[in-house]
Amino acid sequence: MSVDKQLRVMIMAGGTGGHVFPALAVADQLSSDNAEISWLGTRAGIEADLIPKQNIALNFIDIEGVRGRGLLALLKAPLLLWRSITQALAILSDFRPQVVLGMGGFASGPGAVAAWLKQIPVVIHEQNSVAGTTNKLTAIVAKRVMQGFPNTLPKGEWCGNPVRTEISDLAPPDLRFAGRSGKLRLLIVGGSRGALAINTLLPKALAEIDPALRPEILHQTGRAHWQQTIDLYDNETLGLADSELSVVPFIDAMEKAYEWADFVVCRAGALTVAELTSAGLGALLIPFPFAIDDHQTANGQMLVDHGAAEMIQQSALTAANLAAIIVSIMADPDRRLTMAMSARALAKNQAAQDVAKVCKEVACGQ
């Protein structure tokens, strides 16, 4: 690619926020360098709603996962895969990118195969500490392999997980926490789709805490569980003022939520872990028990090992022990700050720039 020719990048990412938001962080970086971006995803993923709002061209292919879906799905898989590759070939022929970037999700596999067939170089980024099936396969044809955690893929380069600059630009926790007083500010996040188990237990746990000590709550429930969670809070009659309890289906401005919070109760998805380090916040991690290859436990272990988080498996979680953990965190502001500073020390805030740089290098034949 000549230096005066505009870079065109096809980004392939979808399904959940854990794939889409890191990819958007890279897209922002590439766009700031005047690259033209097009997106490959599916109609069923979160990208179908989010990407058009970013003024990025969005293309769909028809593909879904088959793992755990039974024999019939496996038998249909080759035909469906070939159809999705054919669709991706047509989209690539129309856009003519110099490089494609796979950030995970069902669209990445067919898109990477189509790019390889058209001799368009492929870059992939694996967010989790345990690689997904798609990235294990696409790594074979990729020119460069980037990864959010060390030692995930054989030829992977550890750059961290891309995080939006609005989060990485937050003041460090020692400055944010300075002068704070009053109740603990507790942020509850179960991922972009919410977490039913956390939604169900939190109101019950709060009911076991002395009413005078109950923390202020900002709780992202996921759109499907919003009303149900509100009803659970109402049933517990917690006595929290409207200003002390906010239950929302989705938080668009996560940077504001992180800036407000003293501590987080959350899953251990790769994006959540990266954002905790970037913002600098201690957390109680509750890994999703049905994550493929239990990758959320592996993701969260890095924070635990560095004193930035506690972790408890969902199978061991009760309202009583969740309440006890919250009370212990409330009682020890020095510990909260130490955990937050330990998280911040793990941040790799140049990840988006690093992935964008690799895309440009690969497009130029380096």
Regions found by a protein language model. Give the residues of each.
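Conserved nucleotide-sugar phosphate-binding/catalytic loop shared by glycosyltransferases and other
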Residues: 6-14, 33-80, 223-225, 315
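Active-site-proximal region of nucleotide-activated glycan assembly enzymes
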Residues: 36, 46, 57, 116-174
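Donor-nucleotide binding loops and adjacent catalytic segments primarily
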Residues: 45, 50, 54, 172-264, ...
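An amphipathic, basic-hydrophobic alpha-helix
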Residues: 70-99
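C-terminal alpha-helical cap of glycosyltransferases
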Residues: 348-366
